Curated annotation (Swiss-Prot):
Name of the protein: Potassium/proton antiporter CemA
Pfam families: CemA
InterPro entries assigned: CemA
GO cellular component labels: chloroplast inner membrane
Membrane topology listed for this record: Multi-pass membrane protein
TM stretches of this protein: 6-26, 107-127, 152-172, 190-210
MF GO annotations: antiporter activity; proton transmembrane transporter activity
Superkingdom field: Eukaryota
Record keywords: Antiport, Chloroplast, Hydrogen ion transport, Ion transport, Membrane, Plastid, Plastid inner membrane, Potassium, Potassium transport, Transmembrane, Transmembrane helix, Transport
Amino acid sequence: MAKKKAFIPFLYFTSIVFFPWWISLCCNKSLKTWITNWWNTRQRETFLNEIQEKSLLEKFIQLEELFQLDEMIKEYPETDLQKFRLGIHKETIQFIKIHNEYRIHTIFNFSTNLISFVILSSYSFWGKEKLFILNSWVQEFLYNLSDTIKAFLILLLTDLCIGFHSPHGWELMIGYIYKDFGFAHYEQLLSGLVSTFPVILDTIFKYWIFRYLNRVSPSLVVIYHAIND
Protein backbone atom coordinates (compact mmCIF):
# COMPACT_ATOMS: atom_id res chain seq x y z
CA MET A 1 0.00 0.00 0.00
CA ALA A 2 2.84 2.38 0.83
CA LYS A 3 4.56 1.59 -2.45
CA LYS A 4 1.33 2.35 -4.30
CA LYS A 5 1.00 5.72 -2.57
CA ALA A 6 4.61 6.50 -3.42
CA PHE A 7 4.11 5.49 -7.05
CA ILE A 8 1.10 7.80 -7.62
CA PRO A 9 3.05 11.11 -7.29
CA PHE A 10 5.77 9.76 -9.58
CA LEU A 11 3.12 8.79 -12.15
CA TYR A 12 1.59 12.25 -11.78
CA PHE A 13 4.96 13.90 -12.44
CA THR A 14 5.50 11.72 -15.52
CA SER A 15 2.08 12.68 -16.86
CA ILE A 16 2.92 16.38 -16.46
CA VAL A 17 6.15 15.89 -18.44
CA PHE A 18 4.41 14.16 -21.35
CA PHE A 19 1.18 16.17 -21.24
CA PRO A 20 2.43 18.99 -23.54
CA TRP A 21 3.48 16.47 -26.20
CA TRP A 22 0.09 14.75 -26.02
CA ILE A 23 -1.79 18.06 -26.23
CA SER A 24 0.31 19.15 -29.21
CA LEU A 25 -0.40 15.85 -30.96
CA CYS A 26 -4.15 16.16 -30.43
CA CYS A 27 -4.21 19.81 -31.52
CA ASN A 28 -2.16 19.01 -34.61
CA LYS A 29 -4.85 16.59 -35.79
CA SER A 30 -7.92 18.69 -35.03
CA LEU A 31 -7.13 22.34 -34.31
CA LYS A 32 -4.83 22.93 -37.28
CA THR A 33 -7.52 21.92 -39.78
CA TRP A 34 -10.04 24.23 -38.15
CA ILE A 35 -7.60 27.18 -38.07
CA THR A 36 -6.69 26.63 -41.73
CA ASN A 37 -10.34 26.63 -42.80
CA TRP A 38 -11.14 29.66 -40.65
CA TRP A 39 -8.18 31.64 -41.96
CA ASN A 40 -8.82 30.80 -45.60
CA THR A 41 -12.60 31.35 -45.58
CA ARG A 42 -13.50 33.89 -42.90
CA GLN A 43 -10.44 35.96 -42.15
CA ARG A 44 -10.36 39.10 -44.26
CA GLU A 45 -8.11 41.42 -42.30
CA THR A 46 -4.35 41.33 -42.63
CA PHE A 47 -2.41 42.02 -39.45
CA LEU A 48 1.33 42.37 -39.82
CA ASN A 49 4.03 43.40 -37.44
CA GLU A 50 6.86 45.71 -38.41
CA ILE A 51 9.20 42.88 -39.39
CA GLN A 52 6.66 41.19 -41.63
CA GLU A 53 5.74 44.49 -43.28
CA LYS A 54 9.42 45.06 -44.01
CA SER A 55 9.75 41.55 -45.46
CA LEU A 56 6.70 42.05 -47.65
CA LEU A 57 7.96 45.42 -48.81
CA GLU A 58 11.32 43.94 -49.78
CA LYS A 59 9.63 41.16 -51.74
CA PHE A 60 7.39 43.55 -53.64
CA ILE A 61 10.34 45.84 -54.37
CA GLN A 62 12.06 42.85 -55.92
CA LEU A 63 8.97 42.15 -58.01
CA GLU A 64 8.80 45.79 -59.04
CA GLU A 65 12.41 45.63 -60.18
CA LEU A 66 11.55 42.57 -62.22
CA PHE A 67 8.69 44.43 -63.88
CA GLN A 68 11.01 47.33 -64.65
CA LEU A 69 13.40 44.85 -66.18
CA ASP A 70 10.47 43.55 -68.18
CA GLU A 71 9.94 47.01 -69.63
CA MET A 72 13.62 47.31 -70.53
CA ILE A 73 13.72 44.08 -72.55
CA LYS A 74 10.66 44.60 -74.70
CA GLU A 75 12.79 44.15 -77.78
CA TYR A 76 12.86 40.43 -77.03
CA PRO A 77 10.35 38.14 -78.78
CA GLU A 78 6.79 38.15 -77.44
CA THR A 79 6.96 34.48 -76.45
CA ASP A 80 9.93 35.12 -74.18
CA LEU A 81 8.17 38.08 -72.57
CA GLN A 82 5.08 35.97 -71.91
CA LYS A 83 7.20 33.31 -70.25
CA PHE A 84 8.89 36.01 -68.18
CA ARG A 85 5.57 37.50 -67.03
CA LEU A 86 4.23 34.03 -66.27
CA GLY A 87 7.28 33.34 -64.11
CA ILE A 88 6.74 36.56 -62.16
CA HIS A 89 3.07 35.67 -61.70
CA LYS A 90 3.96 32.23 -60.33
CA GLU A 91 6.52 33.72 -57.96
CA THR A 92 3.91 36.18 -56.65
CA ILE A 93 1.38 33.40 -56.04
CA GLN A 94 4.02 31.27 -54.32
CA PHE A 95 5.02 34.17 -52.09
CA ILE A 96 1.38 34.75 -51.08
CA LYS A 97 0.96 31.05 -50.27
CA ILE A 98 4.09 31.04 -48.11
CA HIS A 99 2.90 34.11 -46.22
CA ASN A 100 -0.55 32.55 -45.73
CA GLU A 101 0.96 29.33 -44.37
CA TYR A 102 3.19 31.33 -42.04
CA ARG A 103 0.20 33.16 -40.56
CA ILE A 104 -1.67 29.87 -40.06
CA HIS A 105 1.42 28.40 -38.38
CA THR A 106 1.69 31.42 -36.07
CA ILE A 107 -1.96 31.23 -34.97
CA PHE A 108 -1.75 27.46 -34.52
CA ASN A 109 1.39 27.56 -32.36
CA PHE A 110 0.07 30.37 -30.19
CA SER A 111 -3.30 28.64 -29.71
CA THR A 112 -1.66 25.30 -28.90
CA ASN A 113 0.64 26.85 -26.29
CA LEU A 114 -2.25 28.75 -24.73
CA ILE A 115 -4.38 25.60 -24.53
CA SER A 116 -1.46 23.65 -23.06
CA PHE A 117 -0.90 26.34 -20.42
CA VAL A 118 -4.57 26.37 -19.38
CA ILE A 119 -4.83 22.56 -19.21
CA LEU A 120 -1.54 22.12 -17.33
CA SER A 121 -2.46 24.90 -14.88
CA SER A 122 -5.81 23.25 -14.15
CA TYR A 123 -4.18 19.82 -13.91
CA SER A 124 -1.56 21.13 -11.49
CA PHE A 125 -4.21 22.91 -9.40
CA TRP A 126 -6.27 19.75 -8.93
CA GLY A 127 -3.14 17.74 -8.13
CA LYS A 128 -1.67 20.05 -5.50
CA GLU A 129 -1.36 17.27 -2.93
CA LYS A 130 0.77 15.17 -5.28
CA LEU A 131 2.94 18.20 -6.06
CA PHE A 132 3.44 18.78 -2.33
CA ILE A 133 4.58 15.17 -1.95
CA LEU A 134 7.03 15.55 -4.84
CA ASN A 135 8.32 18.78 -3.34
CA SER A 136 8.89 17.09 0.01
CA TRP A 137 10.82 14.30 -1.73
CA VAL A 138 13.07 16.81 -3.48
CA GLN A 139 13.67 18.76 -0.27
CA GLU A 140 14.50 15.58 1.62
CA PHE A 141 16.92 14.49 -1.10
CA LEU A 142 18.70 17.85 -1.10
CA TYR A 143 18.78 17.97 2.69
CA ASN A 144 20.58 14.62 2.87
CA LEU A 145 23.37 15.82 0.58
CA SER A 146 26.59 17.11 2.09
CA ASP A 147 27.38 20.82 2.00
CA THR A 148 30.22 20.18 -0.45
CA ILE A 149 27.90 18.44 -2.94
CA LYS A 150 25.30 21.19 -2.50
CA ALA A 151 27.90 23.88 -3.19
CA PHE A 152 29.13 21.98 -6.25
CA LEU A 153 25.58 21.64 -7.64
CA ILE A 154 24.84 25.32 -7.02
CA LEU A 155 28.08 26.33 -8.74
CA LEU A 156 27.35 24.02 -11.69
CA LEU A 157 23.83 25.38 -12.07
CA THR A 158 24.92 29.00 -11.89
CA ASP A 159 27.72 28.48 -14.42
CA LEU A 160 25.27 26.86 -16.82
CA CYS A 161 22.66 29.61 -16.43
CA ILE A 162 24.69 32.77 -15.86
CA GLY A 163 28.27 31.74 -16.60
CA PHE A 164 30.66 33.01 -19.26
CA HIS A 165 29.29 30.75 -22.01
CA SER A 166 25.63 30.99 -20.96
CA PRO A 167 24.55 33.75 -23.45
CA HIS A 168 24.80 31.32 -26.37
CA GLY A 169 22.62 28.81 -24.54
CA TRP A 170 20.08 31.49 -23.64
CA GLU A 171 20.07 32.65 -27.25
CA LEU A 172 19.19 29.13 -28.43
CA MET A 173 16.56 28.64 -25.72
CA ILE A 174 14.83 32.01 -26.13
CA GLY A 175 15.02 31.69 -29.91
CA TYR A 176 13.37 28.26 -29.72
CA ILE A 177 10.56 29.55 -27.47
CA TYR A 178 10.12 32.59 -29.71
CA LYS A 179 9.88 30.35 -32.76
CA ASP A 180 7.60 27.87 -31.00
CA PHE A 181 5.06 30.62 -30.41
CA GLY A 182 5.19 31.38 -34.13
CA PHE A 183 6.66 34.86 -33.86
CA ALA A 184 8.93 36.31 -36.52
CA HIS A 185 12.66 36.40 -35.80
CA TYR A 186 13.59 39.78 -34.32
CA GLU A 187 17.33 40.02 -33.81
CA GLN A 188 17.29 43.18 -31.67
CA LEU A 189 14.66 41.83 -29.26
CA LEU A 190 16.45 38.49 -29.02
CA SER A 191 19.78 40.20 -28.28
CA GLY A 192 18.11 42.36 -25.64
CA LEU A 193 16.60 39.37 -23.85
CA VAL A 194 19.86 37.42 -24.00
CA SER A 195 21.84 40.33 -22.56
CA THR A 196 19.41 41.21 -19.72
CA PHE A 197 17.81 37.93 -18.60
CA PRO A 198 21.02 36.29 -17.25
CA VAL A 199 21.84 39.51 -15.39
CA ILE A 200 18.44 39.47 -13.70
CA LEU A 201 18.91 35.81 -12.75
CA ASP A 202 22.37 36.55 -11.36
CA THR A 203 20.98 39.35 -9.19
CA ILE A 204 18.15 37.16 -7.88
CA PHE A 205 20.55 34.32 -7.13
CA LYS A 206 22.98 36.52 -5.20
CA TYR A 207 20.08 37.94 -3.20
CA TRP A 208 18.91 34.39 -2.45
CA ILE A 209 22.37 33.43 -1.20
CA PHE A 210 22.53 36.53 0.96
CA ARG A 211 19.06 36.18 2.52
CA TYR A 212 18.34 32.44 2.59
CA LEU A 213 21.56 30.41 2.61
CA ASN A 214 23.31 32.69 5.10
CA ARG A 215 20.47 32.01 7.52
CA VAL A 216 19.90 28.30 6.85
CA SER A 217 23.42 27.01 6.19
CA PRO A 218 26.32 29.44 6.68
CA SER A 219 28.82 26.61 6.15
CA LEU A 220 27.37 25.99 2.69
CA VAL A 221 27.93 29.65 1.78
CA VAL A 222 31.55 29.44 2.94
CA ILE A 223 32.17 26.29 0.88
CA TYR A 224 30.45 27.82 -2.14
CA HIS A 225 32.61 30.95 -2.05
CA ALA A 226 35.74 28.85 -1.52
CA ILE A 227 34.98 26.69 -4.58
CA ASN A 228 33.95 29.71 -6.63
CA ASP A 229 37.19 31.54 -5.84
